[in-house]
Design a protein with these regions (language model features):
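Conserved phosphate-donor/acceptor-positioning beta-strand/loop module used by diverse small-molecule
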Residues: 2-21
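PAPS-dependent sulfotransferases, especially Golgi type II membrane carbohydrate sulfotransferases
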Residues: 17-64, 72-149
Length: 149
């Protein structure tokens, strides 16, 4: 573990929270937090606060990127990620969706995993800005830190 390389994919916190809130998860102690936007945004903040705290405390070797930047140039981001991992470039990574179709992924978004990367979920929060507005103060520190307006 001390030499583990950590990969963190960021996404606009508003889109993350909205996506979790709108997902039909099987309820358990964690997923019950996604039944309303208030608890969803508070859980997001708690998790991201933990990440920031332990990254600094443990001096974790992390590759942090924004989903939106990946969408803009998947090959460049994949090259940077493989370099971070000390792995040679392999163009097969760009065909991840073809490989995923041959395997089972235990995720609520399985259908999306088997598709080429797409932009349609970026900025989806704008359609729900009014509903998210009461929770902006919870997300604001992360919006600023991660470069979202």
């Amino acid at each position: 573990f001390p030499d583990a390389k950590i990969i963190v994919a960021l996404r606009d916190p508003r889109d993350v929270c909205l996506s979790c809130y709108m997902q039909s998860f099987d309820l358990n102690q964690a997923m019950v937090n996604f039944l309303d936007l208030g608890s969803t945004t508070r859980l997001y903040a708690a998790v991201m606060d933990l990440w920031r705290h332990y990254r600094a405390l443990l001096e974790l070797d992390a590759f942090v990127y924004r989903y939106e930047d990946l969408i803009d140039d998947i090959e460049a981001m994949a090259r940077r990620l493989l370099a971070f991992l000390g792995e040679p470039w392999d163009s097969t990574v760009l065909r991840y969706h073809e490989i995923a179709k041959k395997q089972y992924a235990n995720t609520p978004s399985y259908q999306n995993v088997t598709l080429p990367i797409y932009r349609k979920a970026i900025g989806r929060w704008r359609s729900y800005a009014e509903q998210l507005a009461p929770h902006r103060n919870v997300l604001q520190p992360f919006l600023e830190e991660f470069g979202y307006k």
